[in-house]
Amino acid sequence: MLKLIFMMLFMFPLSFLKNSYWMVQNLIFLLAFIFMINLSSMNYFNYISYYFGLDMISYGLILLSFWICGLMLMASEKVFTYNNYKNLFIFMILFLLFMLVLTFSSMSVFMFYLFFEASLIPTLFLILGWGYQPERLQAGVYLLFYTLLASLPLLIGIFYILNFMDTLSFTLLLNYMFTDMNLLYLSLIFAFLVKMPMFLVHLWLPKAHVEAPVSGSMILAGILLKLGGYGLLRMFSLLQVSGIKYNYWWISVSLIGGVLISLVCLRQTDLKALIAYSSVAHMGIVLSGLLTMTYWGLTGSYALMIAHGLCSSGLFCLANISYERMGSRSLLINKGLLNFMPTLSLWWFLLCSGNMAAPPTLNLLGEISLLNSIVSWSWVTMIMLAFLSFFSAAYSLYLFAYSQHGKIFSGVYFFSVGTTREFLLLMLHWLPLNMLILKSGFCMLWLY
C-alpha cells in the first residue's frame, strides 16, 4: 500500500510536464491494476503504520477511487483538446485521488476527519475552475457551507471521544460502545448524513452536479457521496445503543424522502439534474439499510454504494457526450437521439437499466439485500419500498425513453458517431458493474 502512495506522490510532478495527460491517465489505471493484484481478503486491518491501514471496506472504495479518477481524465478530453489549464486539471485530480485514498485508509478518527474535509478543496476547485455557468460560484458556496457546518459538530465529537477514551484508533474503539450519549450520537452522525446526502439536507447536491464539469460530477457521484456511507459504517460500532433508539427517525425521513425525490425526478428536464436527484433517491435507500444495523443492511448498502458509483458516473458521462454534440442538457432538445447517435443508444439502455437495478447488475444484489434488511426491521416500510422501487424504474425508463425515442429536435441536421474513447469509457463503467455480481463475495463477505 505504501508503494502505491509513493507512486501517487511521484505522479504530482508529472502533471506539470507538457504532454503528460494520457500518461497520467495510464499510470492511474496501472495503479488500479497493481492494487487489484494486492487483494488480500483480510477482515482485520492490514496495517501500513500506526495511522494507516486497510481492510475490506476500504479496499473496494479505494479501488473505485482509482477507477473513477482514471475515467475522469478519459471523459474530460475537451480540457485536453482546448488546453484549458490541463496541467492544473491533472494536478487537481491527482490531489483529489491522493486525499481519497488517505481518507479510506485512515485508522485514526481524526486523520479520517482531516482528509474527509481536505477532499472538499479540489472538488471545489474543479467546480469553480472548469464548470459551465456563472452560477457555479453559488453551487460552490452551497457545497462548502453545507459540508463545513455539518462537520463542526463531528470535530467536537471526535475531541470528546479523545478526552473520554484517550485514543482515536478505529481498532481500539471497536471494543467500546457509548451508551446514552444522544448529543454525541447526533454530532458524530450528522456530517455523514449531509455528505450522503440525506433528504432535507440534499440541496447542495443537485446544484453542485448541474454546475460541475463532467469530471466533477463523476467524482461527486462516484466517490464523494460514498464518504458519508463509509463514515457511518466506521462510526456505528460506537453508537449501537443510541442507534437502536434513534435510527428510526433517519430511516423514516430517508424512505419518505426517497419516494418524494423519485417523483421530483419525473419532473426534470435537465439530464444532469435528473441523474443527480436519482442519486439522492438511491442514497436514501442505502442510508436506511445502513441504519438498520443488520448484516444484510450493512453489506447491501456497501454493494449498492459501489454499484451506484459506477452506474451514476457512467450516466453523467453519457449526459456529457450528448451535451458536447447538442450544446444543451435539456431533454426538450436531447430527444430522439436514436436517430442522431444510434451507437450510443445501447449504452443509454444498459446504464439506465443498471440505474433501476435490473439483473445482472450489482445494483440488483445491493437493492435486494437492502429490501431484505429494511423489511426485516419493520413491515410498515414495505409500502415506501414498493413506491421507491416502482418510481426508480419509472424515472430510469423516462430518462431512456424520452431521450432516445420520439421525434428528433428539428435544429439538428447531421448524424453523429461516438468515438472509440467514448465507447471505451462507457464500457469501463458498465463492465465492472455487471462482472462484480459474479464476485459478489467482495461486497458481501467483508463482515464476519
From Swiss-Prot:
Record flagged with keyword Transmembrane helix: yes
Chief location of this protein within or outside the cell: mitochondrion
Membrane spanning stretches: 22-42, 56-76, 89-109, 110-130, 141-161, 183-203, 213-233, 246-266, 273-293, 298-318, 331-351, 374-394, 423-443
Pfam families: Oxidored_q5_N, Proton_antipo_M
Catalyzed reaction equations: a ubiquinone + NADH + 5 H(+)(in) = a ubiquinol + NAD(+) + 4 H(+)(out)
Compartments it resides in: Mitochondrion membrane
EC number: 7.1.1.2
Keywords: Electron transport, Membrane, Mitochondrion, NAD, Respiratory chain, Translocase, Transmembrane, Transmembrane helix, Transport, Ubiquinone
Gene Ontology biological process: ATP synthesis coupled electron transport; electron transport coupled proton transport
GO MF assignments: NADH dehydrogenase (ubiquinone) activity; ubiquinone binding
GO cellular component: mitochondrial membrane
Topology relative to the membrane: Multi-pass membrane protein
Role this protein plays: Core subunit of the mitochondrial membrane respiratory chain NADH dehydrogenase (Complex I) that is believed to belong to the minimal assembly required for catalysis. Complex I functions in the transfer of electrons from NADH to the respiratory chain. The immediate electron acceptor for the enzyme is believed to be ubiquinone.
Family recorded in the similarity comment: Belongs to the complex I subunit 4 family.
Protein name (Swiss-Prot/TrEMBL): NADH-ubiquinone oxidoreductase chain 4
Species this chain originates from: Anopheles quadrimaculatus (Common malaria mosquito)
